[in-house]
């Protein structure tokens, strides 16, 4: 893995210190918690770190009371661990875990053009993902679209396009 690589994926956010050996807690940004136990090397991005990211070897990764704990090689004191608070833990996109058919990375949906199947009109581009619903929500302008098979009938992240069949009245729910 090299720092020059593009296409980073943020997989966690560094939280508070834990213990006195330089361990940190982390906010998990994956629906597959087991993925963290295989991490060997990551790049940290954030205030006080190089703009291109700082390579860190993961010495250990485990869960304590449903909280991810990370131990980075060379981070051995509380003060060293505190300096990492808030950093984004990233990996190259090429090292993302494999998905099952019909599963998508949220980051791949951002920027997709959303097209109404009935009218053929563009509703805009997905600007964000919101976990606020059972299936998640695509944020398209001021419109929140449930990410459900019955609504998102064609999903093609490679073509940056999502075709939707919106239930009657959905457009009016979120409009000012």
UniProtKB/Swiss-Prot annotation:
<keyword id="KW-0143">Chaperone</keyword>
<dbReference type="GO" id="GO:0042274">
    <property type="term" value="P:ribosomal small subunit biogenesis"/>
</dbReference>
<dbReference type="Pfam" id="PF01782">
    <property type="entry name" value="RimM"/>
</dbReference>
<comment type="function">
    <text>An accessory protein needed during the final step in the assembly of 30S ribosomal subunit, possibly for assembly of the head region. Essential for efficient processing of 16S rRNA. May be needed both before and after RbfA during the maturation of 16S rRNA. It has affinity for free ribosomal 30S subunits but not for 70S ribosomes.</text>
</comment>
<dbReference type="InterPro" id="IPR011033">
    <property type="entry name" value="PRC_barrel-like_sf"/>
</dbReference>
<feature type="domain" description="PRC barrel">
    <location>
        <begin position="101"/>
        <end position="170"/>
    </location>
</feature>
<keyword id="KW-0963">Cytoplasm</keyword>
<dbReference type="GO" id="GO:0005840">
    <property type="term" value="C:ribosome"/>
</dbReference>
<dbReference type="GO" id="GO:0006364">
    <property type="term" value="P:rRNA processing"/>
</dbReference>
<comment type="subunit">
    <text>Binds ribosomal protein uS19.</text>
</comment>
<keyword id="KW-0698">rRNA processing</keyword>
<keyword id="KW-0690">Ribosome biogenesis</keyword>
<dbReference type="InterPro" id="IPR002676">
    <property type="entry name" value="RimM_N"/>
</dbReference>
<protein>
    <recommendedName>
        <fullName>Ribosome maturation factor RimM</fullName>
    </recommendedName>
</protein>
<dbReference type="InterPro" id="IPR011961">
    <property type="entry name" value="RimM"/>
</dbReference>
<dbReference type="InterPro" id="IPR009000">
    <property type="entry name" value="Transl_B-barrel_sf"/>
</dbReference>
<dbReference type="InterPro" id="IPR036976">
    <property type="entry name" value="RimM_N_sf"/>
</dbReference>
<dbReference type="GO" id="GO:0005737">
    <property type="term" value="C:cytoplasm"/>
</dbReference>
<comment type="similarity">
    <text>Belongs to the RimM family.</text>
</comment>
<dbReference type="Pfam" id="PF24986">
    <property type="entry name" value="PRC_RimM"/>
</dbReference>
<dbReference type="GO" id="GO:0043022">
    <property type="term" value="F:ribosome binding"/>
</dbReference>
<dbReference type="InterPro" id="IPR056792">
    <property type="entry name" value="PRC_RimM"/>
</dbReference>
């Amino acid at each position: 893995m090299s720092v020059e690589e593009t296409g980073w994926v943020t997989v966690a956010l560094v939280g508070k210190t834990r213990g006195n050996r330089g361990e940190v807690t982390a906010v998990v940004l994956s629906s597959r918690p087991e993925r963290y136990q295989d991490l060997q090397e990551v790049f940290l991005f954030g205030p006080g770190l190089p703009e291109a990211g700082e390579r860190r070897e993961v010495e250990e990764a485990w869960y304590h009371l449903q909280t991810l704990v990370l131990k980075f090689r060379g981070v051995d004191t509380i003060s060293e661990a505190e300096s990492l608070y808030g950093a984004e833990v990233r990996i190259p996109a090429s090292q993302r875990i494999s998905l099952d058919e019909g599963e998508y990375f949220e980051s791949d949906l951002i920027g997709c053009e959303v097209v109404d199947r009935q009218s053929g009109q563009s509703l805009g581009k997905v600007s964000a993902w919101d976990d606020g619903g059972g299936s998640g929500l695509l944020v398209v302008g001021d419109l929140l679209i449930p990410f459900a098979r019955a609504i998102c009938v064609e999903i093609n992240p490679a073509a940056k396009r999502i075709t939707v069949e919106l239930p009657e009245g959905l457009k009016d729910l979120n409009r000012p």
